[in-house]
Regions:
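A short glycine-centered flexible hinge/capping loop motif at secondary-structure junctions
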Residues: 9, 13, 17, 21-24, ...
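Generic hydrophobic transmembrane alpha-helix motif, especially the helices
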Residues: 11-74, 79-83
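Hydrophobic alpha-helical segments of integral membrane proteins
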Residues: 26-34, 38, 108, 148-151, ...
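Amphipathic cytosolic juxtamembrane alpha-helices at the membrane-cytosol interface
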Residues: 4, 24-27, 82-86, 91-118
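Glycine-rich helix-loop "coupling/hinge" segments at transmembrane-helix boundaries
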Residues: 51-55, 80-81, 130-174
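Hydrophobic alpha-helical transmembrane segments of multipass integral membrane proteins
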Residues: 1-20, 46, 50, 105, ...
Length: 195
């Protein structure tokens, strides 16, 4: 779930940044307002609504999480691209006749691979937490599928009966899974988390 949704999120965010860096001031203004509007809405509400309608298939959950979580990454990639487009090697590529598509996808984005890897890891951790939240609340997840959120949901009754260890293990696995993606995402810039 995490890797698939993160791939969709990073792909949409990169394409959004490509469109938003076109030379038209109207497009830049429109896309700035569009992303601010999307960021003002809580994505968890939309994810829960669309997941409850979808029927709980895994691919659909991955797609919904990816489609509802791209805004923060798009804002970060767009800011980095705007800075990168002012650099000397981009000016040289423009002089050599590079198209806007080539400037973004073959010149700028390859130089942002550390940032993209970091965003990929953060988005994967976010997607895992979202899927666990959906499964915990029983929204849009297949009850026959194996999920840490479903395990936590089923173990809450045991918690009230004094069996705290039933909640501990799925919660610890979920925590360690999210932590591992966070560590992987910060290791790309050489300043990883020291444990």
């Amino acid at each position: 779930v995490g890797v698939g949704a993160s791939f969709i999120t990073t792909l949409i965010a990169s394409f959004y940044a490509y469109i938003a860096t076109l030379n038209s001031n109207f497009i830049k203004e429109l896309f700035d307002r569009l992303i601010d509007a999307f960021l003002s809405l809580p994505s968890i509400i939309f994810i829960m609504i669309f997941s409850s309608i979808s029927g709980g298939r895994l691919f659909t959950i991955i797609l919904i999480i990816g489609l509802c979580s791209w805004m923060q990454s798009a804002k970060v990639i767009l800011g980095a691209l705007k800075t990168m487009l002012k650099s000397d090697f981009i000016a040289q590529a423009k002089i050599n006749g590079a198209t806007h598509f080539k400037l973004i996808f073959f010149e700028a984005l390859p130089n942002l691979k550390a940032l993209l890897f970091t965003l990929f890891g953060i988005n994967a951790a976010h997607a895992i937490a979202m899927e666990a939240t959906l499964s915990f609340f029983g929204v849009g997840s297949d009850l026959s599928a194996i999920s840490l959120g479903l395990m936590l949901n089923e173990s809450t009754q045991a918690l009230f009966m004094g069996s705290w260890w039933v909640v501990l293990f799925p919660g610890a696995v979920l925590f360690l899974l999210i932590l591992s993606f966070a560590i992987l995402s910060t290791s790309s810039n050489g300043k990883g988390i020291k444990i």
